[in-house]
Swiss-Prot record:
Catalytic residues of the enzyme: 8, 129
Annotated keywords: Amino-acid biosynthesis, Cytoplasm, Histidine biosynthesis, Isomerase
Name of the protein: 1-(5-phosphoribosyl)-5-[(5-phosphoribosylamino)methylideneamino] imidazole-4-carboxamide isomerase
GO annotation, biological process: L-histidine biosynthetic process; L-tryptophan biosynthetic process
Similarity comment: Belongs to the HisA/HisF family.
Source organism per UniProt: Methanoculleus marisnigri (strain ATCC 35101 / DSM 1498 / JR1)
Length: 239
């Protein structure tokens, strides 16, 4: 199982939010410095979120993200504010390995098929942000149907992987809820990366044993509640 530290960027700075709220941001400083630190500690890749894009400022941080993507030369997946095929293509052409499309994939599901046909499914990840079994879109404000049904649909449209975020536990550093993860893994064949609430090597091990392909570490990693080497050891045990 792969481990992807989150590098969430708001107004040019690395931040962590609680429950997706910008007013609850904790600022950690230079995103590039954090990216290099996590890679030096052995991360399998980076999970980059352009929060300004998610909040409607699509191109903000673009130069910064492009620069450290080129510098690090590591696997990078990116989400946040991807509202069109053109947005996604711009990031993929800039060197991002995989784009994450969430709200727009629900609004315009055929976008997944178009991107998969043009760039290959392995570079297209559908984001599934769920609360109480419902996909949440538009900043986690509006429910849009069963997360399991959407997962199956995205898979059928050609998404090469899924990012599952449990909104109920995201940013709280209180541990994962494994049941919805196992239900999702039983319904799809594509790799599933899990985000939200991962706060200990035990959480990582539970996801590994369930069959998740990867885990995104965010708030607990930056707060020092979990150390990256310990998470990596749990992720790669038995390999």
């Amino acid at each position: 199982m792969e481990i992807y530290p989150a590098v969430d960027i708001l107004d040019g700075r690395c931040v962590q939010l609680v429950q997706g709220r910008p007013e609850a941001a904790t600022v950690y400083g230079d995103p590039a410095a954090w990216a290099h630190r996590w890679l030096d500690e052995g991360a399998d890749g980076l999970h980059v979120v352009n929060l300004d894009g998610a909040f409607g400022r699509a191109r903000k941080n673009a130069d910064l993200i492009r620069a450290f993507t080129r510098e690090t030369e590591t696997f990078t997946e990116l989400g946040g504010g991807i509202r069109s095929v053109e947005d996604a293509a711009g990031w993929l052409d800039a060197g991002v390995d995989r784009v994450i499309v969430s709200t727009q994939a629900v609004r315009e599901p055929e976008m997944i098929r178009t991107l998969a046909e043009e760039f290959g499914g392995e570079r297209v990840m559908a984001g599934i942000d769920a609360r109480a079994g419902e996909v949440m879109i538009e900043g986690w404000e509006r429910p849009a149907g069963s997360y399991l049904s959407w997962a199956e649909r995205f898979e059928s449209l050609g998404a090469g992987s899924l990012l599952y975020t449990n909104v109920d536990v995201e940013g709280l550093q209180q541990g994962i809820a494994i049941e919805p993860v196992t239900e999702l893994l039983a319904r799809v064949k594509v790799p599933v990366v899990v985000s939200g609430g991962i706060s200990s090597p035990g959480d990582v091990a539970a996801l590994r044993d369930a069959g998740a392909a990867g885990a995104v570490l965010g708030s607990a990693l930056y707060a020092g509640k979990v150390r990256l080497p310990e998470a990596m050891e749990a992720a790669h045990a038995n390999e």
